[in-house]
Amino acid sequence: MDINVLTIDATRIAIQERQATATAIAESFYKKIEAEDGEINAYLTLSRDRALAQAAKIDAIADRGDDLPRLAGLPVAIKDVISTKGVRTTAGSKILEEFIAPYDATVVQKLEAAGAVILGKTNCDEFAMGSSNENSAYGPVRNPRDKSRVPGGSSGGSAAVVAAGTAVTSLGSDTGGSIRQPASFCGVVGLMPTYGRVSRYGLIAFASSLDHIGPFAKDVKDAAIMLEVIAGRDPMDATSAEVAVPKYSDEIGKPVRGMKIGVAKEYFGEGLDPEVKASVEASIQNLAKAGAEIIEVSLPHTKYAIPTYYLVATAEASSNLARFDGVRYSHRSKEAKTLSEMYRKSRDEGFGAEVKRRIILGTYALSAGYYDAYYLKAQKVRTLLAQDFDEAFAKVDAIVTPTTPTPAFKLGEKADDPLAMYLADIFTVTADLVGIPGISVPCGSSKDGLPIGLQVFAKHFQEATMIRVAHAVEHALAAV
């Protein structure tokens, strides 16, 4: 069996028809990881015992001839900011180097209940803060499409394992583009659901009003199936929504004829790579040929999105990361002689430079005398951004944009320029700020063979619409 072409359905059918066992499939993936991941560095921890125990359960179901669960035997990887009971969970940080999660995140529980086999935990920017996966305490992840380039961040490891074929699907988190941007850079599908669509219980918090969990997959259908499994109300997360979960995979293949699709003019201006622009515009033309009506829309406050995001996100991070103090969890400084010294030295030794930078910025934004000037003003602009999208969605069913301004950049290219790194998220942060769903789907390649992604936005809880449009883009590209 060629594990490189496995999908969710193909995996389940192969096990059901006894073409392969779940155990054999899992072992094949571990062999591939051992052979190939050393150079990519996408996995931080492998959960072999847990995975093989789960695979054995699936094989027992198949042996009895019973119906297999939806994700039976599916090899999945989990971003290392999501708790997995009994498995090391580091958030890419030295401060959690030896932390063993005491419980499973809700999304992990749901995946295993549906039959998925969790291979291990993926590398990420420390506490999900970054756009290149160069901020991990455990070394950078390399892009499987070009190992001299970044995979994107912060969920770079989760995108890379799908692109490299060392997992069939994976989970990541998205706070400012951390699913969609790496999906674009690695040439896979990355889906960020509406805020509240998927439980955040068990996610190590970066910015609680912006954090989302979502899937990576090779194609839109598998991303849709993954969302069906992990979505839904969770009593353990007060922000999760009591909204029925549709069968998103039913949208695959449905026509876009008659749909109104918006093109946001602010996303096609200065700074957009010409090859990215050409690929995205070609996909928009394909949607028009398929019968969609293309309408230009305006999102005028987009230019304020980056400063707004970095004020809101860092303010929330400074509060959330206060819990890592040397008293609980993992790292405690051995040099400290007093309690205050323990706090200071443990955090200084445990946090990396980018995390420290964001904690300082967020603490400053929340401090007396600056709260109104910065944080409160950012929240007001956030409201204006939401109004922009409300006005646009009054005219259209979905909005398409480039996912990123450029294809994947070189390792080290932006590492010493935080502002240049932050600007890499300019097309993705708006969806997080207003809580709408977004998906990145491959739409072409640069002359150097680097993947290019197209992004689709939809109204709150209208992931089905977004998936239909994304699949139409995918289908048109496959037909070329």
Curated annotation (Swiss-Prot):
GO terms for biological process: translation. The keyword Lipoprotein does not apply. It comes from the Bacteria. The active site is at 79 (charge relay system), 154 (charge relay system), 178 (acyl-ester intermediate). Keywords: ATP-binding, Ligase, Nucleotide-binding, Protein biosynthesis. GO terms for molecular function: ATP binding; glutaminyl-tRNA synthase (glutamine-hydrolyzing) activity. Pfam families: Amidase (PF01425). It catalyses: L-glutamyl-tRNA(Gln) + L-glutamine + ATP + H2O = L-glutaminyl-tRNA(Gln) + L-glutamate + ADP + phosphate + H(+). Residues 133-156 are annotated as: Disordered. One of its GO terms (cellular component) is glutamyl-tRNA(Gln) amidotransferase complex. Its EC number is 6.3.5.7. InterPro entries: Amidase, Amidase_CS, Amidase_dom, AS_sf, GatA. Belongs to the amidase family. GatA subfamily. Heterotrimer of A, B and C subunits. HAMAP family: GatA. Allows the formation of correctly charged Gln-tRNA(Gln) through the transamidation of misacylated Glu-tRNA(Gln) in organisms which lack glutaminyl-tRNA synthetase. The reaction takes place in the presence of glutamine and ATP through an activated gamma-phospho-Glu-tRNA(Gln). NCBIfam families: gatA (TIGR00132). This is Glutamyl-tRNA(Gln) amidotransferase subunit A. It comes from Koribacter versatilis (strain Ellin345).
